[in-house]
Amino acid sequence: MPLASIYADLSGFTDYIDRAIELGMIADAVKALHVIREEFQNVVHDDFGGRKVRFIGDCIHALHAEGDHRETNSEETIMEAAKCAGAIRSSFELCKSALVGVNELGLAVGVEYGQTPISKIGIQGDRSVRVASSKTTSVSEAMQKSCAHNETRFGPEVLKLAPVALNDLISSDGMAGDLQFDDVSTAVSAPAVAEVAAPYARAHAPSAVADTRAHLEKK
């Protein structure tokens, strides 16, 4: 079935690690990586009902689809994938405001839509691993790699199928700049997330929601 493939990768991470080694801040760097990766996964899974395929170092590969067991709603899938991509960036900005020494990091995001088989390998249960491989996943990764320090880029199939409101945010080559959740939500005239279940707080949720994220709690 067709679905949306999302790659989100930290840019400048190698330089960040080199600097952390020089300054003796390895523990802070390891903490930052784990917090940011957990935040990415929580946005994908808890906020948007998507699935993480895997982490590749400081990069997450995720999948999203809207519809039923018979067919995928392409327009809804693309809209929600765009919101998810924006929410990942918004939550990344929240992480940057709470963690030490990560202000120079950027985030490159690539999104594409198309047929993608999904399976699992390994021992059934916690020891199994989700796998997904297709032209769509390859293109979404290529879109991510073509981004500069803080950009989001959509693939050609997204450009063909995206609603007009979303296309207004995207250039002819798929670039969408520093795209965040509020940008997409406003463009498609969708209400912002009204409620977020505790203990998670989201940068893309209404400001009235208290920041109760345990791993971002200020001391």
Whereabouts are the PLM-identified features?
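Polar, enzyme-active/binding microenvironments
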Residues: 92
